[in-house]
Swiss-Prot record:
The protein, known as: Penicillin-binding protein 1A
Originating species: Xylella fastidiosa (strain Temecula1 / ATCC 700964)
Pathway assigned in UniProt: Cell wall biogenesis; peptidoglycan biosynthesis
Transmembrane parts of this sequence: 6-26
GO MF entry, a single one: serine-type D-Ala-D-Ala carboxypeptidase activity
Substrates-to-products reaction catalysed: [GlcNAc-(1->4)-Mur2Ac(oyl-L-Ala-gamma-D-Glu-L-Lys-D-Ala-D-Ala)](n)-di-trans,octa-cis-undecaprenyl diphosphate + beta-D-GlcNAc-(1->4)-Mur2Ac(oyl-L-Ala-gamma-D-Glu-L-Lys-D-Ala-D-Ala)-di-trans,octa-cis-undecaprenyl diphosphate = [GlcNAc-(1->4)-Mur2Ac(oyl-L-Ala-gamma-D-Glu-L-Lys-D-Ala-D-Ala)](n+1)-di-trans,octa-cis-undecaprenyl diphosphate + di-trans,octa-cis-undecaprenyl diphosphate + H(+); Preferential cleavage: (Ac)2-L-Lys-D-Ala-|-D-Ala. Also transpeptidation of peptidyl-alanyl moieties that are N-acyl substituents of D-alanine
Topology of the protein relative to the lipid bilayer: Single-pass type II membrane protein
Residues annotated as catalytic: E90 (proton donor), S460 (acyl-ester intermediate)
Cellular component, GO annotation: outer membrane-bounded periplasmic space; plasma membrane
Periplasmic-side segments: 27-809
GO biological process: cell wall organization; peptidoglycan biosynthetic process; proteolysis; regulation of cell shape; response to antibiotic
Protein family: In the N-terminal section; belongs to the glycosyltransferase 51 family.
Residue ranges annotated as Cytoplasmic topological domain: 1-5
Length: 809
């Protein structure tokens, strides 16, 4: 007996010691874990990751950036039945317990003890899931489980039940980069929460358990099983819905499919510029902070720009030969539509041109083709008219080709991906706001932004900058310069003999006519007359870097490597009266709470805000290397130009706090150049632009050697626009693909939309000018140049040879 009592005493002692040790261990663990628990008060001001939204100036969606889809909602925006679906699925006693479901924990412990499973369901309330989602990792351990329980109790003590449920619904992962119930509803069903049906609510409630492997797109069978057998039945058991409602929902097939937010304005190159600028400004996290970025892009103009570039490149291809099918696939004679469509997998649409595979052709010249969505299209015989070959001789079964919508609804035309590229950039000339930007034919195919990154030779479209320097130096539009052969020789004995494009010479001619006709030899002689150093320094006033401009006479022919955006910026100086503006794209930035955190305040061109700068660069001389500036035969006092009856553009004075753009060049030089460039449109290389029926259209075409580049830069109304066409491999565009043929039609089509209902921009002579007759032409001349004009017309001396030789250094 005593021995038994001794054993019992020892056993009791051991049990007491073990209990104490257990209590101490548990207490130590509790202290160790609880002391390291995060402050859950942050949940009241939690910032969930949200994508960045980019909008046009008129509020249309351009792009959404970010690794996740999330659109946080308040609990009051969640329909009651949707809340019930989640409660039935995840935590039926959510509004009853204090964060811990002890029944669920007991059930989980029993399963652990009676099975060989290491992980068992049950035991995690919605509050515990919130604790895990925000503060813990996914490690499966008792230590993490204890931390989860402790955090859940703390959360329940400081947050209301609806606040906890709101956090859960906004934080949970639903697969396919969708976080939160609102993003899931939009992605899987393209609906807002209040538009969901019961079957859709139940499907969404079943996703968080298996978000990647059990969502209704990845595995619709598994998702339906969970919806029907678990979620809906649990809702019935809890009296959230009736059995009839559940049966009706179960009868509906799974119909989820990807739904991306509807992009309202296609401007991918501009959107990428915004993305890069936001990262530079706020760091990589900028894409997940829910910023709303409003750009300067005009939705209507951007869509017009995209359409114009696509049409222009399609027409370019139509002028050249059909290159054949994009690829050919051998298909079985009995292959059905679905089999044919499967061959298009991985072939994306580009620039509005859709890939199709030829099913068959008809003797009448039509072709039946299949799209990737399994739909069939009939191409009429006219679809290949531009190739000069009927469709039934051009195509065969299995050919993969491109089509795009025709002018009439339901019509399709045969196309081919263009071998050339094009870019269009359009600015508000008065403040530099980017209104439209197209960086290439297809952002999908190539993300290289040719508007801002491609450096190409502008050719003759650079000449207005050289002519501007000459006018500043003392030339005037009526100055006579010989269009005659000339040979330049450097110190090493190398010679350069520039040529006109047509290989002909017109002899002495006014520089106005030389610009209108784009005579190369006159441009070279002008530059040689005013000096390379002077010209380079002067041209930097347009925003170019001096090291971008070649330090030789070839500069006058546009051999500098410049971006289309920089050319447009330079032309803006002519369009706005002589001020240098800075292009800009981001107008406003709002945070996730729609609070304004950034507002751009660009420098604005304003002629009435500053006195006219009539001495921007060096003083002029009366004679430059023997060139006559024109003899005045009659001088009249300055008088205003007659205005027509059309409305004219008047630029309102800006707010006093608006920064002023610096004056770049003399406004009188601007007036002369604008007048000359308007003549380029009226009677020069850009007469096609007369179809716009406006008197304020001015610009200059540009082409480079072997037709590698084609340009048109010009302005009208408030906009300055540059269009470039060329090939990325610097190969020729083809015979006679000049700027007026390849680029100008794109410019015209775009500006027809851009200038609709816009007032006519004036070009009135500013103060400090006198109207006089020079060399048989009436021109406006700067007052200080009147006394410098020669008393005789320039004539080549008879003793001079046809070819003159100059030294160049």
């Amino acid at each position: 007996m005593y021995r038994l009592r001794g054993w019992l005493g020892w056993l009791l002692t051991i049990l007491i010691i073990l209990t104490l040790v257990g209590i101490l261990a548990a207490g130590s663990m509790y202290y160790a874990i609880s002391s390291k628990l995060p402050d859950i008060r942050n949940l009241k001001q939690v910032e969930l990751q949200e994508p960045m939204y980019v909008y046009s100036h008129d509020g249309l969606l351009i792009a959404i950036f970010g690794e996740i889809r999330r659109y946080p909602v308040q609990i009051k925006e969640v329909p009651e039945q949707l809340k019930q679906a989640f409660l039935a699925t995840e935590d039926a006693r959510f509004y009853e317990h204090s964060g811990i479901d002890y029944k669920g924990i007991a059930r989980a412990i029993w399963l652990l003890a009676t099975t060989n499973e290491k992980r068992v369901p049950g035991g995690s309330t919605i509050t515990q899931q919130v604790a895990r989602q925000f503060f813990l990792n996914s490690e499966y351990s008792y230590k993490r489980k204890l931390a989860e329980i402790l955090l859940a109790r703390k959360i329940e003590s400081q947050l209301k039940k609806d606040e906890i449920l709101e956090l859960y619904l906004n934080k949970s992962f639903f697969g396919n980069r969708a976080y939160g119930i609102a993003a899931a509803a939009e992605f899987y069903y393209g609906k807002k929460l209040n538009e969901l049906n019961l079957d859709e609510m139940a499907s969404l409630a079943g996703i968080p358990k298996f978000p990647s492997s059990g969502n209704p797109i990845t595995n619709p069978a598994r998702a339906r099983e969970r919806r029907d057998l678990y979620v809906l039945q649990r809702m019935v058991d809890l009296n959230f819905i009736t059995q009839d409602q559940a049966n009706a929902a179960k009868a509906i097939p799974m119909h989820a499919k990807p739904h991306e937010p509807p992009v309202q304005v296609y401007a991918p190159y501009a959107a990428e510029m915004v993305r890069q600028e936001m990262i530079a400004k706020y760091g990589g996290a900028a894409l997940n902070k829910g910023y709303h970025v409003t750009t300067t892009i005009d939705g209507t103009l951007q869509m017009a720009a995209e359409t114009s570039v696509r049409n222009g490149l399609a027409l370019y291809e139509h002028r050249h030969r059909w290159r054949g099918a994009e690829q050919h696939i051998e298909v079985d004679a009995n292959a059905d539509t679905a089999t044919l469509a499967a061959h298009l997998s991985g072939i994306s649409s580009q620039g509005g041109m859709f890939p199709v595979i030829v099913a068959r052709t008809t003797p009448e010249g039509s072709a039946i083709v299949v799209r990737s969505d399994r739909s069939e299209l009939t191409l009429p015989p006219a679809a290949s008219r531009w190739t000069g070959t009927p469709l039934n001789k051009l195509l065969k079964r299995g050919d993969v080709v491109r089509v795009r919508p025709g002018e009439k609804r339901g019509e399709w035309t045969l196309e081919q991906l263009p071998s050339a590229q094009s870019t269009l950039v359009s600015l508000d000339a008065n403040n530099g706001a980017l209104r439209a930007l197209v960086g290439g034919f297809s952002f999908t195919a190539n993300k290289f932004n040719r508007a801002t990154q491609a450096r190409r030779q502008p050719g003759s479209s650079f000449k207005p900058f050289v002519y501007s320097a000459a006018l500043e130096k003392g030339f005037n539009p009526a100055s006579i310069v010989p269009d005659a052969p000339v040979i330049f020789r450097d110190r090493r004995g190398h010679t350069w003999s520039p040529q006109n494009d047509d290989g002909k010479f017109q002899g002495p001619m006014r520089i106005r006519d030389a610009l209108v006709q784009s005579r190369n030899l006159v441009s070279v002689r002008l530059l040689d007359a005013i000096g390379i150093d002077f010209a380079r320094n002067y041209i930097t006033q347009f925003g170019f870097e001096e090291n971008e401009i070649p330090p030789n006479l070839s500069m006058s022919l546009g051999t500098a490597s410049l971006t289309p955006l920089s050319i447009a910026r330079g032309y803006a100086v002519f369009a706005n009266g002589g001020f240098r503006i800075d292009p800009w794209l981001i107008d406003e930035i709002h945070d996730r709470e729609h609070k304004l955190i950034f507002k751009n305040n660009p420098k604005v061109a304003c002629s009435s805000c500053t006195s006219a700068n009539t001495n921007v660069t060096q003083s002029t001389s009366h004679l430059v290397d023997g060139f006559n500036f024109g003899a005045p035969t009659k001088t009249e006092p300055s008088k205003p130009v007659k205005n027509n009856n059309e409305p004219t553009q008047t630029i309102p004075s800006p707010d006093p706090n608006t920064p002023m753009a610096p004056r770049a060049i003399d406004e009188r030089v601007v007036f002369q150049l604008v007048s000359m460039m308007r003549d380029v449109v009226l009677r020069g290389t850009a007469t096609a632009a007369r179809s716009l029926n406006r008197q304020d259209i001015a610009g200059k075409t540009g082409s480079t050697n072997e037709h590698r580049d084609a340009w048109f830069s010009g302005f009208g109304g408030p906009y300055v626009t540059t269009v470039w066409v060329g090939r990325d491999d610097f190969q020729s565009l083809g015979y006679r693909e000049y700027g007026g043929k390849a680029a100008l039609p794109i410019w015209i089509e775009y500006m027809r939309t851009a200038l609709k209902d816009k007032p006519i921009a004036r070009n009135a002579p500013p103060q400090g000018m006198t109207q006089t007759t020079l060399n048989g032409a009436t021109e406006w001349v700067k007052n200080e140049d009147i006394n410098h004009l020669q008393d005789h017309d320039f004539k080549l001396h008879e003793e001079e040879s046809d070819e003159q030789t100059f030294d160049i250094f």
